[in-house]
């Protein structure tokens, strides 16, 4: 392993912010969130029109913090391309094309564009992404559903689930590739994956209406009722999609996606808030059980992660329901910046291969 200090810039674009981090090897020297006002974003017709502004604000932030623009690797949150295996990918023309013109448009698609534009300004600087949400290693039978013109897609919190798996494996003194794990990422969306020897062989689609409902997403809905709603004339296609992802789950039931507010309402005696949150927890527990079946019951551990794993109300009730399957371990938070930096550093040290996107 080289003793040279490796400098890494990490970029994680969100809908109203860009999270930025600078690492010197494993040590974070800057973690910053660049916020954008609604008025500032309203002038742009789409997320790609925001690219120059986001790039310039990032450079201004680095300068203001006294961080030299000198990096060995720039790694960004990956976009919604076609399905690919897990790993670290070099940003190339094919990735830039597919993120700009792909069917699924999301602000995460611009991350690789920012990374590529900045890396071009530096000699021998790598532009990378790692474990994007569309990582697909599902079993062939897991893709099928009851209509041949439709199929189950793999859209999940791959980056944090895999980083949490590696973290747990390191604590246990084993390799991620030697474990069978069920991992539940619980944030604005919820995905639960069955990880068999380093590959996620089954996971719910946390974006498009599959699995438990979450703070912002509806999860699996009764199909016939959904069809009737689509043809009722009350909502447009975009409005229906928003009711599935963005305005579903706790937002639809309780008017908020903030679980802290929901817990405060429960503490104050709000029976409806308790029922709805308990129903969400119940759905997550059922999905954990289903993923244990995908692993034929051979589960070494169940890992709870994401922002909601900070809430003892949620984790304690999940533990009650699923601890008969395997020991439950809690790793709160998303840690996406750290996970991206760890992937970049592993590449720079020659410990992880760089995959080619095609």
Give the location of each predicted region.
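Short glycine-rich, Thr/Ser-proximal phosphate-binding strand/loop in the N-terminal lobe
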Residues: 8-49
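Phosphate/pyrophosphate-binding loops at sites that engage ATP/ADP/AMP, CoA/4′-phosphopantetheine
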Residues: 58-73, 171-174, 288-300
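Glycine-rich phosphate-binding loops at beta-strand->alpha-helix junctions
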Residues: 299-318
